[in-house]
């Protein structure tokens, strides 16, 4: 029965675009997948990212001198309805707590922004420039807000607390820290076969969670939800046969071969020479994005090299912590001397 999943192609590793990775955006790649698996996983991860990750949001507000949301505040341009709408756009992060109270007090002319909120060490404002209200000369604006942890969207009715002080107005809350998720499917090559899938995921967040962490959390959620469907003891499963030492040595030796042995086109070979890349190990440690930044190195050269590396069981973006190994270099040099 183990062949049901052991014979399937599995992605080698998760890669990401280093140049664009930030606290609010990440672009991730995984390949190869059996045909159809990338679509299944991409769609599932997207739904979980958008709906199931925990975040923080303002759930209620109390403004001094205001009893309901249809009131106006003396000296303030926006009415209470507009202020509540602005509060829904405030992005926050709670540290070590699930609920907190924040407040703001402003007297006189000026603009109130999210960065003006008085918060404790357990609350962090992710968009401090977000507009809240515009005050005139005779304004005295005083407001207390409750911040809670949650997921997805929660309506004002569900945020209503019967024990809250008079004048407390519950508001709709959008807890999700994920702004947007896109995924695309393209072809991936395994040896001479090109009918496999490559999954590309783009994740935008509000900064309260990093894109790579958000992806990891969503994968963990999916794994936990699927675990009940496994009706056998996974620990009793015999280990899959490991690669033979000969196969490992062959891959290792390929890393120490020169790029000249790849028999590349003149243009590609010159690009690698100008970039100072001599060994295949140096080449595969580069990401595709890094290679495309090499002078005169284009997509055509990239695809040419990818095809050749794939036939050798190698790919761009490999993590070679122990490369180069002095013993391996001496060994290969010795073999070359014997041949001469």
Curated annotation (Swiss-Prot):
CDD domains assigned to the protein according to its UniProt record, in alphabetical order: RNAP_alpha_NTD
An example Pfam family from this entry, by short name, is RNA_pol_A_CTD
Give an example GO biological process: DNA-templated transcription
Record InterPro entries: DNA-dir_RNA_pol_insert, DNA-dir_RNA_pol_RpoA/D/Rpb3, DNA-dir_RpoA, RBP11-like, RNAP_asu_C, RNApol_insert_sf
Tagged with keyword Transferase:
yes
Q: Name one GO cellular component term.
A: DNA-directed RNA polymerase complex
Q: Which SMART domains match?
A: RPOLD
GO MF? DNA binding; DNA-directed RNA polymerase activity; protein dimerization activity
What enzyme category does the UniProt record give? Answer: transferase
Region: Alpha N-terminal domain (alpha-NTD); residue ranges are: 1-233
Reactions catalysed: RNA(n) + a ribonucleoside 5'-triphosphate = RNA(n+1) + diphosphate
EC nos:
2.7.7.6
Q: Where is this region: Alpha C-terminal domain (alpha-CTD)?
A: 246-340
Ordered alphabetically, the record's keywords are: DNA-directed RNA polymerase, Nucleotidyltransferase, Transcription, Transferase
Its biological purpose is as follows: DNA-dependent RNA polymerase catalyzes the transcription of DNA into RNA using the four ribonucleoside triphosphates as substrates.
Q: How does it assemble?
A: Homodimer. The RNAP catalytic core consists of 2 alpha, 1 beta, 1 beta' and 1 omega subunit. When a sigma factor is associated with the core the holoenzyme is formed, which can initiate transcription.
Q: Member of which family?
A: Belongs to the RNA polymerase alpha chain family.
Q: What is known of its domains?
A: The N-terminal domain is essential for RNAP assembly and basal transcription, whereas the C-terminal domain is involved in interaction with transcriptional regulators and with upstream promoter elements.
The protein, known as: DNA-directed RNA polymerase subunit alpha
* Source organism (scientific name): Pelobacter propionicus (strain DSM 2379 / NBRC 103807 / OttBd1)
State the gene name recorded for this protein: rpoA
